[in-house]
Amino acid sequence: XXFESXEMR
């Protein structure tokens, strides 16, 4: 994922 998208995987 990407933290810039506000997602956490």
Curated annotation (Swiss-Prot):
<protein>
    <recommendedName>
        <fullName>Unknown protein CP 19 from 2D-PAGE</fullName>
    </recommendedName>
</protein>
